[in-house]
Amino acid sequence: MKLLLASNNAKKLKELQRILDQAGLDSVELLALRDVEAYDEPIEDGRTFADNAQIKARAGVTHTGIATIADDSGIAVEELNGMPGVLSARWSGAHGNDTANNELLLAQMEHVPDERRNAAFVSVCVLALPDGQEFVQEGRWEGQLLRGPKGENGFGYDPLFIPAEEIDGQGRSSAELSAEEKDALSHRGQALRGLVEKIAQVAAAS
């Protein structure tokens, strides 16, 4: 079975591949957008993570005829009423500029005390099949915002986020966790694992 991940993000691709491997889904051939005939990527103008994930998954399966999985994710900061939210990747105005996004968020939270720095990573993953079926899973990873970046692993807001599991432990940011540790805890890992059973069913029937 071929499975398209509607992304060219190498780290997301590796993350999904690890989860498929852990589930023993050796029959699934994972593809990225660069592996299929190019198509115009849709405008992500949804109001929610689920909206945007559906937009991307539907575009992938429509243009390629291949079962497609897509995610939309970001960080929701309690003090900012859930923002950046769906705007996380372009919070500073430039899409995908992690450094600028992190710097802006830190500046906005500069005078906020520790007890009001609660945040959560949120991910919604959608699996869209050629027959029109869609399956949706959401993952949520609670924690707090740090006052400066820590760690070199991960991407996005990982260096600014201390997971709830680490607050009373070693105090590591999500950018200091190993890939395996992050897979086990993270919002995207939760959502992707929620789709594994359905992927296995589709693979067995193909």
UniProtKB/Swiss-Prot annotation:
Its cofactor is Mg(2+). It comes from Corynebacterium glutamicum (strain ATCC 13032 / DSM 20300 / JCM 1318 / BCRC 11384 / CCUG 27702 / LMG 3730 / NBRC 12168 / NCIMB 10025 / NRRL B-2784 / 534). Pyrophosphatase that catalyzes the hydrolysis of nucleoside triphosphates to their monophosphate derivatives, with a high preference for the non-canonical purine nucleotides XTP (xanthosine triphosphate), dITP (deoxyinosine triphosphate) and ITP. Seems to function as a house-cleaning enzyme that removes non-canonical purine nucleotides from the nucleotide pool, thus preventing their incorporation into DNA/RNA and avoiding chromosomal lesions. It is an enzyme of class 3 (hydrolase). This is dITP/XTP pyrophosphatase. CDD domains: HAM1 (cd00515). Keywords: Hydrolase, Magnesium, Metal-binding, Nucleotide metabolism, Nucleotide-binding. Gene3D superfamilies: 3.90.950.10. InterPro entries: dITP/XTP_pyrophosphatase, ITPase-like_fam, RdgB/HAM1. GO terms for biological process: nucleotide metabolic process; purine nucleoside triphosphate catabolic process. SUPFAM superfamilies: ITPase-like.
